[in-house]
Amino acid sequence: MTMSHASPDAARSRIVLASNNPGKLREFAALFSTAGIDIVPQGELGVSEADEPHATFVENALAKARHASRATGLPAVADDSGLCVPALLGAPGVYSARYAQRAGREKSDAANNAYLVEQLREVADRRAYYYCVLALVRHADDPEPLIAEGRWAGEIVDAPRGAHGFGYDPHFFVPALGATAAELDPAAKNAASHRALALKALVARLGEIR
C-alpha cells in the first residue's frame, strides 16, 4: 500500500477507520483529509464493533484495526483513546467510554462526566490528560503495524463549559488555551488535540509503508 499526499490531484489513499463513534468520525475525517487520506468508516462496510478486552490502549487499538482489516480486506486504522487522571490512578483510562456504566450507572457522556466530577470532589489535584494511540495495519496479520501516540494535557473543572466536542470535553480545561476542549471550535481542537498529535506522528511514518 502506498500513500501519496503530494498534490490534491494525486490518487488518494483509502483506508478503513475502525470506529462508528460519530464524534471520532468527524474529527478523523478532518484530520486524515489534511494528510491526503480518504477514510471509510467501518459501519459503511457492514463491519461490527470489535471487542476491547485489553487493559492497555495500544492492545485495544490493534485489536480494532485488525478486526476491521480482516472483515474488509483493506488497510485499517484504529484509535483507542481516553481520559487519564493521575489522582485516580489513571482512571477512567481505557474504560473512559463506560466509566459510569462500570459503577452501575447508565452509559452516556453525561453520566460519565457526572461520575468523574463526583470522584474528584475531595481531590485537590485536578491534572488530567487525554491520551490517544493510533494503530495502522496494511493487512489483518501485519507483523509491523504503525503505532503512534499523542497526549494532551489539561485539568478537570467541575462545571461543564462549551457546546462543541464530545465525551469529557466540557470538563477538560486546557490552561495553555484558556478554554475547555468543548469551547474550542473543531478546527482549533483538531490542531491541538491528542488525536491531532497522534496523527501527525503517524503521518510522519507513512513512508515506512510499502
From Swiss-Prot:
InterPro entries: dITP/XTP_pyrophosphatase, ITPase-like_fam, RdgB/HAM1. One of its GO terms (biological process) is nucleotide metabolic process. It comes from the Bacteria. Binds 1 Mg(2+) ion per subunit. The active site is at D80. Its cofactor is Mg(2+). Keywords: Hydrolase, Magnesium, Metal-binding, Nucleotide metabolism, Nucleotide-binding. SUPFAM superfamilies: ITPase-like. Mg(2+) binds at D51, D80. GO terms for molecular function: dITP diphosphatase activity; ITP diphosphatase activity; metal ion binding; nucleotide binding; ribonucleoside triphosphate phosphatase activity; XTP diphosphatase activity. Its EC number is 3.6.1.66. Homodimer. Belongs to the HAM1 NTPase family. NCBIfam families: RdgB/HAM1 family non-canonical purine NTP pyrophosphatase (TIGR00042). Pyrophosphatase that catalyzes the hydrolysis of nucleoside triphosphates to their monophosphate derivatives, with a high preference for the non-canonical purine nucleotides XTP (xanthosine triphosphate), dITP (deoxyinosine triphosphate) and ITP. Seems to function as a house-cleaning enzyme that removes non-canonical purine nucleotides from the nucleotide pool, thus preventing their incorporation into DNA/RNA and avoiding chromosomal lesions. This is dITP/XTP pyrophosphatase.
